[in-house]
Structures are given as C-alpha cells and as structure tokens.
Amino acid sequence: MLMRPPVTLGSGIRYTEVLDPKLHGCLVSLHFAVPRDAESAPVHALLTDLLTAASAAYPGLGALSARLDALYAADLSASLTLCGDCTDLHFSASWLDDALTPDGRPITAQVLALVLGCLLRPHAQNGAFNEALFAVCRQNLLDEIDGILGNKREYALQLAAETAFSGEPAAIPPQGDRGRVLCASPAACLTLWQEILHTAPIGIIAVLPRENPAVAETLRQGFAGISRRPRPVTWRAPSPCRAVPVRIDDEIPISQSKLVMIWKYRDIPRRTVDLLTKMLSGTGTALLFVNVREREGLCYDCSATHSPLKHALVIECGVHPGREEDAIAAIGAQLEALRTGAHPDSLQGEAVLGMEYAAACALDSASGIANRIAAAAYFGVSPDPAADSAELRRISRDDIMRAAGALIPDTVLVLHGCGEPNA
C-alpha cells in the first residue's frame, strides 16, 4: 500500500490518494466539515438523502439507483458523523476498477460524473430541492428519528449527551429535532448546501488499485467552477468539567433498565484514553465484561466509548431492574482498579493487541483505509498502523493509572424499566 502526500485541488480542498494493488475496486470519499446548531442539524441529515437519491440528470426516484446498477453495481452513499461540536458530511462512491469490468468497458469517468452531478447539480428547480423528492427524504428522516425514540438504548445515550453537553452543539441529536425537521423547507436545504459548497473545508480520499491521474483531475475540474471561501473549523471542543456530577432518573416501559455514565477530563493524551477504554470494554478480558457482566451478572451488556474531541468517556449498559445501584458501584470499581493498578498485568497488552488487530483489519478494504485516513485528520490517530502501534506500546501502566485518576464524574442517567418487554 502506498499513500501519497496530500495535495490541494482547490481552495480548502485537500486530496489524499492511496494505491493498493490487492484491491479490485475503487473508492472516492468526500468529507465536508461543517459547524452545527439546532437549525442546521436536521438539514445536514436531510442532505445525506437529498443528494444521493436523485440529481438533475437522474431526477426520477429510482433512476439514479438504476444507473448505478448498470455500472456493475457501483454504489453512492452518504452519512453524517458528529465530530466534537461539528459535523462531517460524508459522501462515498465505490465501483469496480476499469481493468476488471467483464466487457472491458471503463466506468471510472462515468461514476465520477454521477458523483459530481449529485453534489454540484442536484435535483432542484427555482432555488429549491424538488418538492416530491424532499417529501420522501423528510419522511425518511422522521421515521429514523421515531426509530431512535423506540430504541431505548439510543434514546438513553441521546438523553445523556443532552445533559452532559448542555448548551454545546454536541448536545444536539445527530438527526436534529423532530419539530425542526417538520419546519425545514426545500429552499432552506438548498441554500445551506450551496453555502457548504462554498465555505466548508473539503477532504477527499481516493483509494485505488492502481495509479489513475484522471481521478484527481476530474475532481479538480468539477470543483473549479465554485467560488470557494473556506472557513476554518475547530474539531477539538473539550466540554467543561462539572464541579458536582448530575444524576437523572426516570421510568420507562421497558423490561430492562438503561444506564449511561459519563466522565470528562481536562488533559490526558488521546491514545491513553483510547487504550483505557479498550481495557474496560472491547475484548474478552475487558474489565466491564469480565467483572460487571459475567462475574456479578449485573447487566445484559456493558460497553465503553471515548469521545476524544469532547474529552468524554461514556459507559452504557442494560441493567437488570432493581440492580441499578449495584451496577453503578461495580462500574466505578473497575475505574478504581485501573486507578490503583489493581488490574491484571495482561489486560493492557491484550487491549493493545486488540487495537492493533482492528488497525490491520482496516487495511483489508478500501472503505477501511479511507476511514482510517479520515480519522487521522479528525482525531489525530496515525494512519500508519506501525506508528500507531509504537505509540500505544509506549503507554505505561502508570500512564493508565494516572489517566483513570484524572477522569471526573459528570453525568449519570438511569432509565428504570417498569416491566413491559418492549426494550
């Protein structure tokens, strides 16, 4: 695998190309970095659907999908990821390499034309997205929001985030507020998208099996007609630590209780917290799995995640009703074990091996490679697995102990199950 040094395709447009001959397909990943607020959040979510369901050249619902299928099942998709207080609007296209098409027909140029057509010439008239398309996409988003409310795990995580990051953009749900989705208009969505095209920093990652200069040149020419005025975006936005943690208790009709605990920190190296998180959750010997779930039988599941841009550690689990306080105490005991060094000697090494394995697996696919490069840009993780492994192995047991001691309790959310089995 060869990763070329990034180049600039235009003002605020960074292009990174990776060549890996073991791959059979090509992938282009476009990332638009945008600030978010309560009004723009639902529009960002709508754009992921509006810009990939149709275009000016393929306006009919299903026409774009049919065209992609005709190009040997090429794919165009979109997603959004919360990065601190900002949003990463991500569009990705993948297709079979020209050298491997059954009839020898080159398709790279056609796929890139479809991608640029969707982004630069969407299905819109008179300064607004097409009404019929907008109605379908809005209903899709409303259904997604309703689905999250029905998924009590996601609902609990959302409520905990709203509490822990109150007053910060990170408190806004990824899909935005349902009421604001209903108030969004086709014209407002197109206006915001045009603003994003002109002002958002753009990161483009191309993962190809062989060198093809036409990919970068096609993208450069595609964006050349846009008057770019990129605005800087700050990804790292540490959330203020509370002097006194807050606790919220509520009852909901589910068969198991939901528990979310959040800690914040001021100044701990990012990979140290990543490794600490892996020691808590993510391996067969992780503390939460072995002690809280298996040994004490307090929960159905228990996992830990790290939000490095917000300086937050999140632990969530489904708890047997009536044992919520036991679970809170047991989770706290695992962090105390890390703080005092009372954890097994092998635990840290096993966590490092798990992280090294995940990094190696990411290199097996074009999407994994692209995601790792994007993570390097947003989160500061080295895209080179060897360099990242060396950094992880430099972390000492004392580093983990100090990190665990520097975590500051912030939020505890308990949704007490009242017995109806619809969790």
Q: Model-found features: residue ranges?
A:
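M16 family metallopeptidases and their MPP-like homologs
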Residues: T16-V18, L23-H44, L61-G117, R153-G179, ...
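Short, polar/flexible loop-turn hinges at active-site or ligand-entry regions and domain interfaces
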Residues: A54-A57, D98-P102, R121-N130
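Short, low-order "capping/linker" segments at domain edges
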Residues: L142-G147, V244-K258, E356-S367, I373
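Short, flexible, solvent-exposed loop/turn segments with mixed acidic/basic and small polar residues
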Residues: L80-C83, C189-H198, S303-S307, M401-G405
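Acidic/histidine-enriched alpha-helical segments
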Residues: S65, R121-D146, R231-C241, A333-A362
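His/Glu-rich zincin catalytic helix
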Residues: M1-L71, D103, D177-R180, P186, ...
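Compact, aliphatic and Gly/Pro-tolerant "microcore" segments centered on a short helix or tight beta-hairpin
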Residues: G127-E195
